[in-house]
């Protein structure tokens, strides 16, 4: 279908820095074109010091909404009129909807991760889960997994206090999920993984300058019944996932999460379902 810009075209976009590398313009614009929707997605390099001006401009220009990425996901909250429950718990926003100048913030990262699991036929309900890392991705994923019925979540991080902070939020707000925080050591991880159903890497090990690194030093700590997941989507198969496959584990990369969070934002802005399989094929072909 031909892609046209008209006087009626609605604008959505991404506020953050740096953002030129983002997959979001490709994902959303191809989805708009495929469905014949009169929207366009652009990126805007916005740092913390000019975030307020950018948000005011979004209102003035009557954009349909926008995504938010680092370094603005926490800083934007005071600039919004309302935030969703999961955004409140997570403490960050990655999607904003503009309805007649009323800005509501959402966090679709955790739900996007759960969508990626669902695409693989996996539900977090009743699962014992181990998460490596305690940054923003870990916080979004852990809280959403708890909301979705996870039985037990253990978060390992070199700085235990960061992991404890996430656990405290879950314990206070979602008491049906048992949580614990611990330091990151191979022996501790091996012990935790013995009873685990799902192991998630929420660190940057495996991507960029860390591409040759893995969160685990040996396959000995894995077992074949374990599902091993990585939030990293480039490369499509991290060193961790290669190691897990050697043991016979089911593996899942971060592509489902990135598409899932985008699909949820797409639905919030347009009311339409993103053609996920079509978008997945396009991204994999790049």
From Swiss-Prot:
Q: Could you confirm whether the keyword Secreted appears in this record?
A: no
Quote one Gene Ontology molecular function term.
shikimate 3-dehydrogenase (NADP+) activity
Binding of NADP(+) occurs at: 85, 133-137, 231, 254
Q: Where is the catalytic site?
A: 73 (proton acceptor)
- Its EC number is 1.1.1.25
Which Gene3D superfamilies does the entry mention? Leucine Dehydrogenase, chain A, domain 1, NAD(P)-binding Rossmann-like Domain
Q: In which pathway does it act?
A: Metabolic intermediate biosynthesis; chorismate biosynthesis; chorismate from D-erythrose 4-phosphate and phosphoenolpyruvate: step 4/7
Work out whether the entry's keyword set contains Amino-acid biosynthesis: yes
Task: Please give the catalytic activity noted in the UniProt record.
Answer: shikimate + NADP(+) = 3-dehydroshikimate + NADPH + H(+)
Q: What function does this protein fulfil?
A: Involved in the biosynthesis of the chorismate, which leads to the biosynthesis of aromatic amino acids. Catalyzes the reversible NADPH linked reduction of 3-dehydroshikimate (DHSA) to yield shikimate (SA).
Name of the protein: Shikimate dehydrogenase (NADP(+))
Which organism was this protein described from? Alkaliphilus metalliredigens (strain QYMF)
Q: Which gene encodes it?
A: aroE
